[in-house]
Amino acid sequence: MTISEMHYDFKVKLDKVASQTKEDFNVAEIDWLLNEAQDVFIKQRYGLNNPHRTGFEVTQKRIDDLSSLHVKQPEQVGITPTLTSGVYEVPLSSLTHTYLFYTRGSVDVTVTNCPTTTMQLRHIQADDLSDALRDPFNQSSITDGVLFNFGKSSGNLATTSIYIYPGTLTLGDVYIEYIKHPRQMFFGTYTYIDGSTTTLTNCELPEHTHSEMVDQAVLIASGIIEHPTYQ
């Protein structure tokens, strides 16, 4: 659906579930509701808060639902990490698109007298990191993968970096696969609160997800209407 069609679908569905109210949402408010619904939809499909607690790639439908936001190679090129005090850092702000959720990562590893090989990154909880670094059976290795976790970027505390703990390995480029932030839908005809504006922007998620997002927007709107402070 185009953004215009999503607005129409929203109005029709809202009228069915909230027919007792004569209140109406304006264009800017419907845009906001659709974008809020999009955020909820993405988090559910990624696995953060879906009721079945299933992850992103558990079912083909979840993979399809977020396929247009899932960034992989070659769209996302390898990034050369910086090395400080034996730890490699990859600022997520250096990715091609605005990062939202991590899905998978790998890194080029150089071993003496062997050709460069690409190994999977292996996430380690911060609480377990110290023990893992001291444990020879749990450290980064060419058989078990390379340890990493997330933290504040060293160059900008408002952003996040991936920190990689190579052990005795020498690392090259890092390859991150991730869910990017979606474009914000915008119907047009108005100006944002900050004075900015943009051209008409349709939803970039797959077509088959649009009706579900409108349903979610109607659910959010219904909750607003039913709230005692709504006038």
Provide a role label for each language-model segment.
Residues 1-231:
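Glycine-enriched, solvent-exposed interface loops adjoining structured elements
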